[in-house]
């Protein structure tokens, strides 16, 4: 165990257009090589596409519903007990839930078949808000894994 003190969480500023901290976090996950302006254009472009495709809901509501649909409630963590390694199901902390949801959405969007990242991201957010798509499947697989290993839940720490 580390003897140093725990690292402080960095505070991020809300994004300029919507004033939302989670959009800024999402932007930072999309960003490559410190090019924040490029990431900003990708995200705001995707939000424009979402606004055109979903008239009933705003892009920010669609984004938040997509995040909620992808966020896992439970995951498995490896625990070594007497020479055997067990996959122990544990609840996911709220900050990790959001981080995993964002990471899975961005990864799923990057693997999609559309031409530009803006289109890929808009498509994945739209799918996730409708409870389908690769990112939602990832969450379902995580939950299935946890359910399959429920017998080892008494090894929780």
Swiss-Prot record:
PROSITE patterns assigned to the protein according to its UniProt record, in alphabetical order: RIBOSOMAL_S7 (PS00052)
One Pfam family this sequence matches: Ribosomal_S7
InterPro entries: Ribosomal_uS7, Ribosomal_uS7_bac/org-type, Ribosomal_uS7_CS, Ribosomal_uS7_dom, Ribosomal_uS7_dom_sf
Gene3D superfamilies: Ribosomal protein S7 domain (1.10.455.10)
GO CC aspect terms: small ribosomal subunit
Matches recorded under SUPFAM superfamilies: Ribosomal protein S7
UniProt-listed GO biological process terms: translation
Highest taxon of the lineage: Bacteria
GO MF entry, a single one: structural constituent of ribosome
Keywords for this protein: Ribonucleoprotein, Ribosomal protein, RNA-binding, rRNA-binding, tRNA-binding
NCBIfam families: rpsG_bact
Function: One of the primary rRNA binding proteins, it binds directly to 16S rRNA where it nucleates assembly of the head domain of the 30S subunit. Is located at the subunit interface close to the decoding center, probably blocks exit of the E-site tRNA.
Quaternary data: Part of the 30S ribosomal subunit. Contacts proteins S9 and S11.
Family note: Belongs to the universal ribosomal protein uS7 family.
Protein name: Small ribosomal subunit protein uS7
Organism the protein comes from: Caulobacter sp. (strain K31)
Gene name in the database record: rpsG
């Amino acid at each position: 165990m580390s003897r140093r003190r725990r690292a402080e969480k960095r505070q991020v500023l809300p994004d300029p257009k919507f004033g939302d901290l989670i959009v800024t976090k999402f932007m930072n996950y999309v960003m490559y090589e410190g090019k924040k302006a490029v990431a900003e254009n990708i995200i705001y472009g995707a939000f424009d596409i979402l606004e055109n495709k979903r008239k009933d809901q705003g892009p920010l509501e669609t984004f938040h519903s997509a995040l909620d649909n992808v966020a896992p409630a439970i995951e498995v963590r490896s625990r070594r007990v007497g020479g055997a390694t067990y996959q122990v199901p544990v609840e996911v902390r709220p900050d990790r839930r959001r981080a995993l949801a964002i990471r899975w959405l961005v990864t799923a969007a990057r693997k999609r078949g559309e031409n530009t990242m803006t289109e890929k991201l808009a498509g994945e957010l739209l799918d996730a808000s409708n409870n389908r798509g690769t990112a939602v499947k990832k969450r379902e697989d995580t939950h299935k894994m946890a359910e399959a290993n429920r017998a080892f839940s008494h090894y929780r720490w």
